[in-house]
């Protein structure tokens, strides 16, 4: 029997959930809801309902919340009370307290509560994490991320920290298998909006791994890069293209003493890996389905999303105070 799925929010992100839901085996998309209507024309023969209560009345087994972050808590709590498994788009909520209420509601109901950190489904990062776990880099020393793009007209309720940096916070801890211990950040609002549109952050993960994040909405091109440096080389993921490259430390001795002293390590071979490139959102949908069916547990849990929110709030706190925050 197929899982009866409903989607709340069919705007800029929700429309992609609609497309992927229709292509996911074992899932029957039966209801859509958005008070703003179907501005992207994705509903097809499905009526567009007014809100979460009507979605629940449609008899759904599972739901995806792709509404603005400010609406996540009320919608998620209503779905949990109705016994509906739910995937909430990132971030889980506007605050740690709200996120905790959501997490507790789904845990109390014995329901699957997943969160949409889609970068975990990116082929480049999946392979990067696997190679790190297998010891290809040896001891991990540093993780650096860049997430830059032009200003998105669709985002108005949060700034770059909760909309974009939340991805990098999640993927850095996930790839390294190490939680954040401290973070320091600075933010700036240059576009005239209430929320920040630029952020730089540096911190330390468990085990002494250094991490830094560069995020903004003011770059006239899209940049999605993750660099993990270890004792044996560096892995570089271009998550916009799904590419992964390994830069190995060289083994041949350098004869030019001045260069050898400056570089610290020598350059070795460069390998770009051939990866099977599926749309990450399709895999996210399959993982959510499998969790509901009890045949998989690779979805991002609400506990993990709550840990992410703690780091995100620490970033904003650090930016406001000008001081490092311990976690």
Task: Give residue ranges: language-model regions.
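C-terminal glycine/acidic-rich active-site capping loop/insertion
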Residues: 118, 232-303, 327
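N-terminal Rossmann-like dinucleotide-binding module
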Residues: 1-44
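Beta-loop-alpha module in the N-terminal Rossmann-like domain of NAD(P)-dependent dehydrogenases
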Residues: 17, 46-105
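Hydrophobic residues in well-ordered beta-strands that form the structural core
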Residues: 88-89, 113-115, 237
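C-terminal helix-rich "cap/oligomerization" subdomain common to oxidoreductases
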Residues: 1, 62-65, 287-327
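Rossmann-like dinucleotide-binding domain that binds NAD(P)(H)
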Residues: 152-221, 227, 303
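A contiguous active-site-proximal alpha/beta segment in oxidoreductase catalytic domains
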Residues: 70, 93-155
